[in-house]
Amino acid sequence: MKLGIVIFPSKMIQDKANGLRKRYDPHYALVPPHITLKTPFETQDEQLESIVNELHTIANKTNPFTLHVGKVGSFAPVNNVLYFKVEKTPELTFLNEEMHNGFFTQEREYSFVPHLTIGQDLSDAEHADVLGRLRMKDFYYEQPIDRFHLLYQLENGTWTVHETFHLGKENN
């Protein structure tokens, strides 16, 4: 079973990102715009309950916070990914750290750069052209964040929510 842990921004931010993703992201139909807290990982079905319990613990230790999204960035020359930059708040950093320590120990492929992907798998020329145009536009959004989501991947490659975790002390 393949799982991932993400934050979904508001519908308004998703709509702005999807307006670009339709043209520049071949993964557009597989998953809504999101901020990745933990990249996809494989696990056994019997571990799911322990994972869910650990995520409840992490959510309870994390206060709700404000998400700040703005400007367009790129991971070039490592890869031709375009994204909306997301401010790295203490809460986002804490969530990411908790999901790579202790129970979730796993080698990181990249350092944590919170972002919303708006384009990927672009040729060098297309990447340079689109990045140049988008950097001239003014993007800035903010919204309160009070939850994150555990996703699982279906056989057709799409992702769906398994469970949602509310930040702060949950009502059990």
UniProtKB/Swiss-Prot annotation:
Coiled coil: none annotated. It comes from the Bacteria. It is an enzyme of class 3 (hydrolase). Gene3D superfamilies: Cyclic phosphodiesterase. A motif (HXTX 1) lies at residues 34-37. InterPro entries: 2H_phosphoesterase_YjcG-like (IPR050580), Cyclic_Pdiesterase (IPR009097), YjcG (IPR022932). Keywords: Hydrolase. This is Putative phosphoesterase BcerKBAB4_1135.
